[in-house]
Amino acid sequence: MITKLKSAVALYMIYRTLRDNPEKDIKYIYFSLELSSELLLAKLMCLYMYEEFGIVISYTELMSWEEILSDEKYEYIQKSRAWLSEISEKLLIFDKALTAKSFYRTVKGLLSEWGTFTKSADGRRELYQKDNPDQYVIVVVDHVGLCVPETGSSKKQEIDTISQYAVGLRERCQVSFFMLQQENRNSSNMDRRKMDMTECSSEDLKDTGNTYND
């Protein structure tokens, strides 16, 4: 249930941002390690139909091969597809296995399409210049605990490397990162909750707390 909730919160954040700011140059890079891109888009379409037309269609109904939709519902689906087409260049979903290397390669590759990497005068630093200074780039990893460790690397090491890459890109390229991560279900965490200490700390996170500190 918690897993579904955090994905739902992330998806609604994306929906709200794109829906409310159609004129802004916003790029979402979404690494969905739990849900397929088709399912995410279906959920976005359902949100749009409900808010725009007041029509309630579940994503299971939308994706079903057996469900026969009414002509009215089909018409609203077609209208909603037009909105999905509008945001297709703003929301880039990757739902395949993720390693630290593929994470860095994908994000930097897209940034190269939206700007230019150059070396500093002394050749010691890499600099980045956006093509559009007003562009917002937001990277979401849902969730980072499902990354795949490279050979010889532990899950913690892989997540820590992803976090290190994110910090470097954040500082160099002005990119925002949302690393969704599961909490530990240990006794100390439960004791803290009983004392109404509900704010998350690095010790509460599963696999590694470095994502919190970074």
Segments the model singles out, each with a brief description of its role:
Residues 36-42, 53, 147-150, 186-190:
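Switch/connector loops and helix/strand junctions flanking conserved nucleotide-binding motifs
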Residues 19-134:
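Cytosolic-facing regulatory segments adjacent to core modules
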Residues 162-214:
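Phosphate-binding/switch region of NTP-binding enzymes
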Residues 44-50, 155, 192-198:
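Short secondary-structure boundary/capping segments
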Residues 5-9, 13, 40:
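Hydrophobic positions on the alpha1 helix immediately C-terminal to the Walker A/P-loop
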Residues 1-2:
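The conserved Walker
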Residues 122, 126-167:
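Helical hairpin unit composed of two closely spaced alpha helices linked by a short loop
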